[in-house]
Amino acid sequence: MVQKSRNGGVYPGPSGEKKLKVGFVGLDPGAPDSTRDGALLIAGSEAPKRGSILSKPRAGGAGAGKPPKRNAFYRKLQNFLYNVLERPRGWAFIYHAYVFLLVFSCLVLSVFSTIKEYEKSSEGALYILEIVTIVVFGVEYFVRIWAAGCCCRYRGWRGRLKFARKPFCVIDIMVLIASIAVLAAGSQGNVFATSALRSLRFLQILRMIRMDRRGGTWKLLGSVVYAHSKELVTAWYIGFLCLILASFLVYLAEKGENDHFDTYADALWWGLITLTTIGYGDKYPQTWNGRLLAATFTLIGVSFFALPAGILGSGFALKVQEQHRQKHFEKRRNPAAGLIQSAWRFYATNLSRTDLHSTWQYYERTVTVPMYSSQTQTYGASRLIPPLNQLELLRNLKSKSGLAFRKDPPPEPSPSKGSPCRGPLCGCCPGRSSQKVSLKDRVFSSPRGVAAKGKGSPQAQTVRRSPSADQSLEDSPSKVPKSWSFGDRSRARQAFRIKGAASRQNSEEASLPGEDIVDDKSCPCEFVTEDLTPGLKVSIRAVCVMRFLVSKRKFKESLRPYDVMDVIEQYSAGHLDMLSRIKSLQSRVDQIVGRGPAITDKDRTKGPAEAELPEDPSMMGRLGKVEKQVLSMEKKLDFLVNIYMQRMGIPPTETEAYFGAKEPEPAPPYHSPEDSREHVDRHGCIVKIVRSSSSTGQKNFSAPPAAPPVQCPPSTSWQPQSHPRQGHGTSPVGDHGSLVRIPPPPAHERSLSAYGGGNRASMEFLRQEDTPGCRPPEGNLRDSDTSISIPSVDHEELERSFSGFSISQSKENLDALNSCYAAVAPCAKVRPYIAEGESDTDSDLCTPCGPPPRSATGEGPFGDVGWAGPRK
């Protein structure tokens, strides 16, 4: 069973496996790999396992595998020489200036060697100078070939061969070989041969060419010519046409009379010398025709031959200005990089962020803790002591306080109780003073490691161990310290805290290194890594904030315009940025509001691909889509309502009147089915009055046609409305036809005084109370669903109505109608309309076939209801 710890180590199981030995190598003389100072190793038989890339130390760290010092010096020297020869900066120009003076001196001496007065004196100096030049150039060439290996593309013999094929390297080897050959073959008693001197002069020109190693001059010329190639080609082409035409015409004019123009080649030579404004004067036209032609073409051709000079001059000026501006822009790189770095550290050192550790680790490696003070035991005074090295501290603790840093130590006799505790920084052991350790439980390492110090001291030879420390380490495997290296540069400046297992209430001041303290017991201590203190973190945070502000100010200063062109470019860039933002804003507005209809050609016929336009993703397009869906739903609802009306037999006029009502109708009152059933059982005749979808009047549900007819005296009305109509449907609650649901009339019809005929209908029902002969059978009445609609009209419709006015029922009369089913006459009929010429008080609805109604005599429960007076 293998258990992994938090630090990536592997702890062996208790059964059948070898125990690992954990120790600080370098503290114990007999420990393996004692050359590694302060390295905490896990000595075991297992091979080192492969770790991730993130867990590997940096290449520059001291803990990683260092290359030999010879290789490091080799690479460093190689890079240095390559930069001096190929990329000279600073003082490296001194060498190149020396080479230039050497080459220039050789050129001057070679010139003086051609003069008879100075020939003898210059030949001796030139010979010596040529030897020096050859030696310098030869050494420089081989150094260049060797130093080119610092570049990855020039490594190896193939890379060196590739570097040697460069144009300037070819020129170098040619000059070197030719100079050696000239000196070897042409020198006889320090006197050069004439042919050797001539070849040497030519080699001086090649030496001057090689002075521009980086080719900046040729690159600048090539860039200018390439940038203005069209203008140059145009000027040269027109100038060449002028040259040919002028030479040919002058040749024709001067051919027979001037000996200077015997051939067309002579005319071309004259034209070239004339148009380039050189004018040797060896050839010139003599006739007036030739002079006139020469003057005309000279005025035209000279301007075109002079154009390339102006084009190249302006191009060079613009290029130089651009290079200066580019250098000015390159100066912004360092402030920009510093601003980015300081901004990241300002962000990463936020104390509320707990997920960023690399920046704090950088400060843990680089921040040096200041000097700390301590009181000496002998003199009782305070003095400054530099920070101790980690290794020296651990050795002192190990040798003086009896610390054990090995998990499986060899058996040794336990120390006596009187063994002295010589730990100078142990705060858990009582001493002779009453103060705690002066380090205040924290010790920081010094920047440099003292590896070899104290190895041979007698303190390192005596090793004491604490049984309590060994027992605690064996009992709690989770407290095994992590495997980290003191020699690693990235961890060389970690902070340590000393924890004492015993109480520190009676602890006294520890002595400085070199002083002994007698103690009764050993000092079990534990070293664990600790982060930076909160105060130090706050200080680092403040420094990062200040650096960020300073970097921001420097970067703003570097953004100042260089010249007027820079200002114009900044304004142009701002204008382009503004236009792009306006375009983006316009696109967003178009996406929200929607674009207008696109202007298309009327004559152009739409193809099959253009028949269906894509959906508009804008808000207006979506609203249009929703509107179309609402219209589609409205059509579907109209279709369903029409089907329902046709199925139930509802006339369309009622629905139109209902939907045309100005005021919403209140909810109809609810009547229980039991009450309605009791009325039906008692009287067997029910008048169901409902409100249709288009009317506020009454509906009289009479017996179905299948019921036996009843002989009743006709009414005085000329046309009683007794024909049945099909019902509108069942009750909303799902009951049978006995349910009576009488909605209240609208608000404008609730007043009894609004119409004169409001009490007439109630009197008609009272008169029908004692006529049981006209009562239909109960079963037929329950199944009947016919109704007569009495629509309500306003004053405008009153004039257009058939009878001149209509009868409306008030709410009180409708309530009386529900409570007086037993008093309805058997042959009573409710007339929804009144004939022409008949008033509402002319006659009774039924002939006197029974006793007079109770309302006429004022007796009975409805005696207070009287007839309404005639309208006047």
Swiss-Prot record:
Please give the InterPro entries that the UniProt record associates with this protein.
Answer: Ankyrin-G_BS, Ion_trans_dom, K_chnl_volt-dep_KCNQ, K_chnl_volt-dep_KCNQ2, K_chnl_volt-dep_KCNQ_C
Mark out the compositionally biased spans (Polar residues).
Answer: 458-475, 715-724
Q: Which GO terms describe its cellular component?
A: axon initial segment; membrane; node of Ranvier; plasma membrane; synapse; voltage-gated potassium channel complex
User: Which Pfam families does this one have?
Assistant: Ion_trans (PF00520), KCNQ2_u3 (PF16642), KCNQ_channel (PF03520), KCNQC3-Ank-G_bd (PF11956)
User: Where do we find the motif Selectivity filter here?
Assistant: 277-282
> How is the polypeptide modified once translated?
KCNQ2/KCNQ3 heteromeric current can be increased by intracellular cyclic AMP, an effect that depends on phosphorylation of Ser-52 in the N-terminal region.
Write one Gene Ontology MF term.
ankyrin binding
Describe what happens upon changing residue 52 to E: 40% increase in potassium current amplitude. Ratio of 1:1
Predominant location = membrane
Q: Any idea which residues bear Phosphoserine here?
A: 52, 466, 468, 472, 476, 478, 507, 672, 801, 803
- Membrane topology annotation: Multi-pass membrane protein
What happens on changing residue 154 to D?
In BFNS1; with infantile seizures
Q: Where in the cell is it found?
A: Cell membrane
> Which ranges does the record list as Extracellular topological domains?
114-123, 184-196, 254-263, 277-287
Q: Where is this region: Mediates interaction with SLC5A3/SMIT1?
A: 222-323
Region annotation Disordered: where it falls in the sequence? 402-422, 442-488, 598-619, 659-680, 693-757, 838-872
Q: Explain what the record says happens when changing residue 201 to C.
A: In DEE7; gain-of-function mutation; results in loss of voltage-dependent channel gating and highly increased potassium currents
Q: Outcome of altering residue 207 to W?
A: In BFNS1; phenotype manifestations include myokymia in some patients; leads to a shift of voltage-dependent activation of the channel and a dramatic slowing of activation upon depolarization
Relay the activity regulation note. Answer: Phosphatidylinositol-4,5-bisphosphate (PIP2) potentiates the activation of KCNQ channels by enhancing the electro-mechanical coupling of the voltage-sensing domain (VSD) and the pore-forming domain (PD). In the closed state of the channel, PIP2 is anchored at the S2-S3 loop; upon channel activation, PIP2 interacts with the S4-S5 linker and is involved in channel gating. Calcium suppresses KCNQ2 and KCNQ2-KCNQ3 channel currents, with calcium-bound calmodulin inducing a change in channel configuration which leads to the reduction of channel affinity for PIP2 and subsequent current suppression.
Which residue spans belong to the Cytoplasmic compartment? 1-90, 146-163, 216-227, 315-872
Family statement: Belongs to the potassium channel family. KQT (TC 1.A.1.15) subfamily. Kv7.2/KCNQ2 sub-subfamily.
| Disease linked to the protein | Seizures, benign familial neonatal 1: A disorder characterized by clusters of seizures occurring in the first days of life. Most patients have spontaneous remission by 12 months of age and show normal psychomotor development. Some rare cases manifest an atypical severe phenotype associated with epileptic encephalopathy and psychomotor retardation. The disorder is distinguished from benign familial infantile seizures by an earlier age at onset.
Free-text note regarding domains: Each subunit contains six transmembrane segments (S1-S6) with S1-S4 forming one voltage sensing domain (VSD) and S5-S6 contributing to form one quarter of an interlocking pore-forming domain (PD). The S4-S5 linker preferentially interacts with PIP2 in the open-state KCNQ2 channel, whereas the S2-S3 loop interacts with PIP2 in the closed state.
Q: How is the quaternary structure described?
A: Heterotetramer with KCNQ3; forms heterotetrameric M-channel responsible for the native M-current. Homotetrameric; forms a functional homotetrameric channel resulting in the expression of a small M-current. Interacts with calmodulin; the interaction is calcium-independent, constitutive and participates in the proper assembly of a functional M-channel. May associate with KCNE2. Interacts with IQCJ-SCHIP1. Interacts (via the pore module) with SLC5A3/SMIT1; forms a coregulatory complex that alters ion selectivity, voltage dependence and gating kinetics of the channel.
Q: What is the protein's known function?
A: Pore-forming subunit of the voltage-gated potassium (Kv) M-channel which is responsible for the M-current, a key controller of neuronal excitability. M-channel is composed of pore-forming subunits KCNQ2 and KCNQ3 assembled as heterotetramers. The native M-current has a slowly activating and deactivating potassium conductance which plays a critical role in determining the subthreshold electrical excitability of neurons as well as the responsiveness to synaptic inputs.
- Name of the protein in question: Potassium voltage-gated channel subfamily KQT member 2
